[in-house]
Amino acid sequence: MTTLMGSYSWTEGLDCSPIDEDLSDGLSPHRSPREKGSETRIRRPMNAFMVWAKDERKRLAVQNPDLHNAELSKMLGKSWKALSPAQKRPYVEEAERLRVQHMQDYPNYKYRPRRKKQIKRICKRVDTGFLLSSLSRDQNSVPDTRGCRTAVEKEENGGYPGSALPDMRHYRETPSNGSKHDQTYPYGLPTPPEMSPLEAIDQDQSFYSTPCSEDCHPHINGAVYEYSSRSPILCSHLSQVPIPQTGSSMIPPVPNCPPAYYSSTYHSIHHNYHAHLGQLSPPPEHPHYDAIDQISQAELLGDMDRNEFDQYLNTSLHDPSEMTIHGHVQVSQASDIQPSETSLISVLADATATYYNSYSVS
């Protein structure tokens, strides 16, 4: 092994004499690059406080070995402020001497403060992908309450069933479910205003469709009605009015339409029209139809002017198109019923229709 090492010249550099010289000077044989850089850097001259604290710090460290260096610095600062100018004067003069000496030793010295390493602040920002995914999930779900919820609460509570954004066509196609509409209509969007009965009748004209052609209903003054009711509100006092379903038909028959068409259309016309009228505020005093049944027919006919209702009773002399008043079909009775009963039922039905038509128009 020694013969191999002796054959190379690099073994001559393994002399320990320089290390011994460094150790004799009191310097560490192993120096890190940071320590070498600190020695080459020129230190600033000490001020008066540093000159005074150099010895005072050692004295406090001996008296209080358990105190941290920061606590010692606080104590030194309070003690320095407590000194009088006369006590500070020798330290101020010593600091001035050191400054002049520093200027002579380093004439080209310029103070360059060290750049402190800035700690990178971790910004707690929510990922944009998470926000987009939560937004898309919120658009497909309906929250339980109208209160705002954070993204974390939505993750814990999970999704919500139902469609959050139903189109307006769904609202128009399913208006009969009044209670369901309040639950399925999206939160955050303005609800459509309530329609008046007259506006509802005008809008119903464009949404009606029947299996028959347009000539199936030429005698309803051009007004068409939708079969399904648009309002769950019913006029309870109108339900007691007897509507005859036997005898002559209210609408003249058309050869293109089946017989079942007239009964369903006639029922939907009255039901839908009275349903819209039910949204209006009731008149001050409602007529009590229960009491009318108890009154004899003679008393009722005695209080009325029969000549006034001749145009309604004599239906054979009028054209069928004149049997409507503002889209409401007049009620008549079959010819096989007694004349007194026919007049009573017709008068009551026509008077009721005239009253509510005039009330809705006004």
Swiss-Prot record:
Locations listed in the record: Nucleus
Which residue intervals define the domain Sox C-terminal in the entry? 245-362
Q: Which GO terms describe its molecular function?
A: sequence-specific DNA binding; transcription cis-regulatory region binding
Residue ranges of the annotated DNA-binding region, renumbered to this chain: 42-110
Expression by tissue, per the entry, reads:
Expressed in the embryonic pronephric sinus as well as posterior cardinal veins.
Q: Which InterPro entries match?
A: HMG_box_dom, HMG_box_dom_sf, Sox7/17/18_central, Sox_C, SRY-related_HMG-box_TF-like
Q: Which is one Gene Ontology cellular component term of this protein?
A: nucleus
Q: Which residues form a coiled coil?
A: none
**Keyword Ubl conjugation among record annotations:** no
What PANTHER family does its record include?
A: SOX TRANSCRIPTION FACTOR (PTHR10270), TRANSCRIPTION FACTOR SOX-7 (PTHR10270:SF210)
Q: What does this protein do?
A: Transcription factor. Binds to the DNA sequence 5'-AACAAT-3'. Acts downstream of vegt and upstream of nodal signaling to promote endodermal and mesodermal differentiation by promoting vegt-induced expression of both endodermal genes (including endodermin) and mesodermal genes (including snai1/snail and snai2/slug). Induces expression of multiple nodal genes (including nodal, nodal2, nodal4, nodal5 and nodal6) and binds directly to sites within the promoter of the nodal5 gene. The endodermal and mesodermal specification pathways then interact to initiate cardiogenesis.
Q: What is this protein called?
A: Transcription factor Sox-7
Species source reads Xenopus tropicalis (Western clawed frog)
Organism placement in taxonomy: Eukaryota, Metazoa, Chordata, Craniata, Vertebrata
Q: Which gene encodes it?
A: sox7
